[in-house]
Every structure is written in structure tokens, then in C-alpha cells.
Amino acid sequence: MAIKIGINGFGRIGRIVFRAAQHRDDIEVVGINDLIDVEYMAYMLKYDSTHGRFDGTVEVKDGNLVVNGKTIRVTAERDPANLNWGAIGVDIAVEATGLFLTDETARKHITAGAKKVVLTGPSKDATPMFVRGVNFNAYAGQDIVSNASCTTNCLAPLARVVHETFGIKDGLMTTVHATTATQKTVDGPSAKDWRGGRGASQNIIPSSTGAAKAVGKVLPALNGKLTGMAFRVPTPNVSVVDLTVNLEKPASYDAIKQAIKDAAEGKTFNGELKGVLGYTEDAVVSTDFNGCALTSVFDADAGIALTDSFVKLVSWYDNETGYSNKVLDLVAHIYNYKG
């Protein structure tokens, strides 16, 4: 029996979550809520400048979407409490608007009949965050959870392997991050972040990110040991994390590479990093990861070691596809939780 999900918000992540769900037998999208017109919704699902045409049929019938012959209820409610998820048997609501990131606001989905809620962004309160390959085993039946951020999903698995093998004394992270929808096509008003208001296609823009600090929430042993920042760059998708750390146990760069490779292949960490962490020694660039479902692909040849305790590690991620696939992994994990 497939897990029935409803998606609130059909933007970049909402649509890529939907696309990813089409490749899973265990998850079925039964409802979508967004304020856009259903015909426009169908158009945006069919055609994607980054990921290409939708692999299947998309039609509109009686105000609903019909995708590959299956009818999906479409609504346009501003208040999640009015979504009546219960009427279509929604097990888990995927909150992808970016607007309801606290327990209080996301709980409206449960009022509407959903059993549980997954937030597709870092929570803005104490709502717990879970990252596959890092702390799924800490889930204890909570009805509202967060899948953290795309950058935390890249950084945390890598940091876990390094810390639990060699120990991280402290570290700094930089993410070179693709453009996102909040940025401006040309210079425009941005009262809180002046640099963020500059034209996205013209600039490399320094920005803040809470991704490194958030690692401490999913991996408590690293709480207070990592911080970081971002550079927004003029590419449409795929980002890369640069993690520079002081190690507690000296190690050669080859030993670090081997530890990450073993984890990626599922030979260590009880196989928890397989399907999450990747490893490559190829001469890759960002577009080589477009559409990659892994959330962190370690680039062995891009990293460097200054000493046997001070190293720079580089890991790629498709900030849309990888993250959206892990949203669905979290959906499946909390649905199948037995206590």
C-alpha cells in the first residue's frame, strides 16, 4: 500500500518532489495545493528549464491534474487548515511553501487531516530536523519534522564520516551555491540583505547560511564546532560544499579518502551512507551532477591537505534533486516507524 502524500507549495522543491515520487512504488501524490492556476501548474510540471520535460503524461481535467492517468486533487487554499487532507486519505503532508516552518503553523496540516508533516526547509523553532545517513535513528514518532536544508544534507553526511573516524576539532564550511528563486534577476530591493538584492546573473554574492550550525542539531557531537557562509553564483543548479577542518586524529589524505569511499559503498556505518554519500575520482564539474539523487558526492581529487590534521574536503550536490529525494526518504521513514 503506497504512502499517500499531499504537497503544499508547487515551486522548485514541490515540483521536484513530485517528479521524484513518480519513480517510487511506495509513495503516491494524491493532492497538490498552490495558489497558481491548474493549467499553469500543468505547464510548469511538463516543462523544466533545469531538469527537462516531464517523463510522462500531464493533463487537466475538471480542475485537477491527471498525471500518467492518475487524478490528483488540486486546491488553492491560503490556509493549510482548510486543505481537508483527510478527505483524500493523506498520510503525510509535504510542506513546501517555505511559509509554515514552525510546529504551530505546520500543525494546521494535521488539523486538515494529515497524520504527519515533513517540512522542506530548516525549522524556525525547535521542530526536530532529520538528515538521512546522519540521524534517522533519532526519530521517535514526532508528527512534525524537518528535512533540514539542501546544504545541511550535503555537509552532515560528510562531516559524520570524518568526525566519527578521525574527529573534527573545529571547521569552516563554504558552499558555492547555485541561484535560487529568492534572488533578483537584476538589481532590486532587498532591505534585509543588500548584497542579496544584486543581479543574480551578474555577480558572485557572499551570503549567510545556517547549514553548518544546523549540523550540530542533527549531529550533536559537532554542536558549536562548525560554522560557515555561502557564495551565490550565476548557475541554475548544483552546488558544492568546501569543508575545511582541523582533525583530532592525524590522518593522511589517502586515509580520509578511503574512509569516505567505504562509507559511500555501504561498507561502514551499518550501510547508512549508501544512497546518500557518493565518491568520485573523475575530473567532474557541476553540471555532471544535475539530476543526481545523492545528497553529497565527495570529489576526491578536488580536496587538499596542508598537514595531516588540517584538510579541505569538497563535496557536490544537486540542491534540488538530491534534497527532494531525501524528503521522500524521510516521508517513508516516519511512515514506517514502529517505535
UniProtKB/Swiss-Prot annotation:
Protein's gene: gapA
Function text: Catalyzes the oxidative phosphorylation of glyceraldehyde 3-phosphate (G3P) to 1,3-bisphosphoglycerate (BPG) using the cofactor NAD. The first reaction step involves the formation of a hemiacetal intermediate between G3P and a cysteine residue, and this hemiacetal intermediate is then oxidized to a thioester, with concomitant reduction of NAD to NADH. The reduced NADH is then exchanged with the second NAD, and the thioester is attacked by a nucleophilic inorganic phosphate to produce BPG.
The EC number(s) this enzyme carries: 1.2.1.12
Family designation: Belongs to the glyceraldehyde-3-phosphate dehydrogenase family.
NCBIfam families in alphabetical order: GAPDH-I (TIGR01534)
Source lineage: Bacteria, Pseudomonadati, Pseudomonadota, Gammaproteobacteria, Pasteurellales
Record-annotated disulphide pairs: none
Protein name (record): Glyceraldehyde-3-phosphate dehydrogenase
Catalysed reactions, as listed in the record: D-glyceraldehyde 3-phosphate + phosphate + NAD(+) = (2R)-3-phospho-glyceroyl phosphate + NADH + H(+)
Keyword Metal-binding appears in the UniProt entry: no
